[in-house]
C-alpha cells in the first residue's frame, strides 16, 4: 500500500498570500489527484492527473509534481479557499488518501 503524507497538517494564510500544500508518497506514483472539502459537505474533485483543474476550479489553483513528490498551490489566497485539501492516488487495486491539510484564513 502506498502511503501519502501531507504537509502541513494545518496552515493559515492571509488573503492574497501564496499557499503551497505538499503530498509525499511512500513509493512512486504516476498520477496524483486533489480534493477540496468544506465543512458539512463531501470532498469535491479539485485537481486531477497532477495538474488538470476540475470544472469550476479557479485558475489561481495549480498542481505539479512527479514520482513521490506532489504539490497543490494557490497563487493568491481568497476567503473561499479555506477548506481541507486531500491528495489521492490510485495504485490498482488500492485507492489511498493523504491525511488532509486544513487551510484557514489568517486574520
Swiss-Prot record:
Region Framework-4, residue ranges: 97-106
InterPro entries with a match to the protein in the record: Ig-like_dom, Ig-like_dom_sf, Ig-like_fold, Ig_sub, Ig_V-set, IgV_Light_Chain
Region entry Complementarity-determining-2, spans: 49-55
GO cellular component entries: immunoglobulin complex
Region (Complementarity-determining-1): 24-33
Region named Framework-1: 1-23
Pfam family, one: V-set
Stretches for region Framework-2: 34-48
One GO term of the biological process aspect: immune response
Region entry Complementarity-determining-3, spans: 88-96
Disulfide bonds: 23-87
SUPFAM superfamilies: Immunoglobulin
Keywords, ordered alphabetically: Adaptive immunity, Disulfide bond, Immunity, Immunoglobulin
Region of interest (Framework-3), ranges: 56-87
Cross-referenced SMART domains: IG, IGv
Additional facts recorded: This chain was isolated from a myeloma protein that bind galactan.
Identification of the protein by name: Ig kappa chain V-VI region SAPC 10
Organism: Mus musculus (Mouse)
Amino acid at each position: 500500500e502506498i502511503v501519502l503524507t501531507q504537509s502541513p497538517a494545518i496552515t493559515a494564510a492571509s488573503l492574497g498570500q501564496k499557499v503551497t500544500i505538499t503530498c509525499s508518497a511512500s513509493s512512486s506514483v504516476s498520477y496524483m489527484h486533489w480534493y477540496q472539502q468544506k465543512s458539512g459537505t463531501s470532498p469535491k474533485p479539485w485537481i486531477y492527473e497532477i495538474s488538470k483543474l476540475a470544472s469550476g476550479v479557479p485558475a489561481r489553483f495549480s498542481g505539479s509534481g512527479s514520482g513521490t513528490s506532489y504539490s497543490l498551490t494557490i497563487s493568491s489566497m481568497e476567503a473561499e479557499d479555506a477548506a481541507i485539501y486531500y491528495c489521492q492516488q490510485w495504485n490498482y487495486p488500492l485507492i489511498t488518501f493523504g491525511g488532509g491539510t486544513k487551510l484557514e484564513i489568517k486574520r
